[in-house]
Amino acid sequence: MFLTQTQEWTRRGAALMAEMQAHFDHRGLRADAMGLVVFERGASGQAEGFAWRGDWPCYPCSLVKAFHLVHGLSMVERGQIAMHADLDRALRDMILWSSNTATNYVIDLVTGTTGDTLLSGQAFDEWRTARERLNGFFTDLGWAEFAGCNLSQKLMDDTRYGREAQYAGADGAYLNVLTPLSVARLMWELFEGDVPLSGPYLERARGELSRVSTHPEAKNSAYQLTEFLGGGLPDGTELWSKAGHNLWTGALESSYFKHDMLRWVRPDGRPIYVVLMTKGQALAETDPQVFPDIGQLLYARLNMAEPVEAL
């Protein structure tokens, strides 16, 4: 496990959870339908922080796109796929405004597959093996937090058909799954640790996740800032994020989720990381302001020099 939960962080995390529940439970933030990881670089140079239900296997929505960004750029760097105009645009758009079409284009290029019509027998087996490369890339990194996760399914605006439905299973048993800790591990390795990217490829991966309140599209909900955690941070805060959000998709297993992974630089120059994954119609649809309000609380508490419980 990459994250150490110290005694201080256990106290701070418990106090933070209590305050979040006091402020947001009535607005849909239920302790049994959420996962939270908060962490920073400790004095030892390793990740220290707090996890609440960090191993919760949850439908991740568009959080998988940050993983595909790393995978795709790594293949370009190693010469396994060639950068071209549409790939360059897709890598940008799947993060900038969370385009599912762009993401699925990247998935096709990375795996050498296409979706849609039904397959059977050996043809389906070979197709499935190729798509499993999406999981294999991260499994091969040896991250314990990725065990049991799945990011091999395409991103759909509603229900699946053809080989995509075959692959996900009739009951959705093989839909995408991530945990808060698996997302936290990706963020840690991307900014503080070691991912299979270097030089301009690493800088691009980090840069794509940057969110700027003065960006021309910042007020557009697709930019995933104003209605997510980053929307509660003061203008001018240096931050990086990728959110996930599903309303009704036609399947209960993938409906009404809202997530965010966020890194910001505190006033003293130290970065802090937050992963929040949630399930529920109130958070996902009814009250879009909950996430920015949570972000405002997190910013206030996690920027403090003193532990939260000292308040």
Residue ranges and their predicted role:
Residues 70-78, 108, 185-192, 300:
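Short glycine/serine- and small hydrophobic-enriched flexible loop segments
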Residues 59-81, 94, 274:
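Active-site SXXK
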Residues 3-24, 30-31, 86-182, 189:
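Active-site-adjacent helix/loop patches that line small-molecule binding or acyl-intermediate pockets
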Residues 35-38, 61, 93, 105, ...:
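Structural recognition of the beta-strand scaffold that forms the well-ordered cores
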Residues 45-56, 87, 165-168:
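Glycine/charged-rich beta-loop-alpha catalytic/anionic-binding loops adjacent to active sites
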Residues 74-93, 103, 197-201:
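Short, well-structured active-site flanking segments
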Residues 12-53, 264-265, 271-274:
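A short, well-structured edge-of-sheet supersecondary motif
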Residues 2-20, 175, 179, 184-311:
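Structured C-terminal helix/loop/strand segments within mature extracytoplasmic catalytic/sensor domains
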